């Protein structure tokens, strides 16, 4: 498993377990490795929304849509 895959897996696990701050950290690290991945931007947005950081979450969803306008998960 690559470093990126490990970060994504850990982020998803923490998100599912309700550890939103940890999930956010993993997704931010993953985005440093792959900044043009719309799914990562969407996952970061979900973590931010779960933390009540709605404006930042909206920015992430918009970034995801800029990268892939067909990405319905971020709308």
PLM feature segments, named:
Residues 5, 39, 73-74:
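Start-of-helix register in tetratricopeptide repeats
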Residues 29-32, 62-66:
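Conserved structural position within tetratricopeptide repeats
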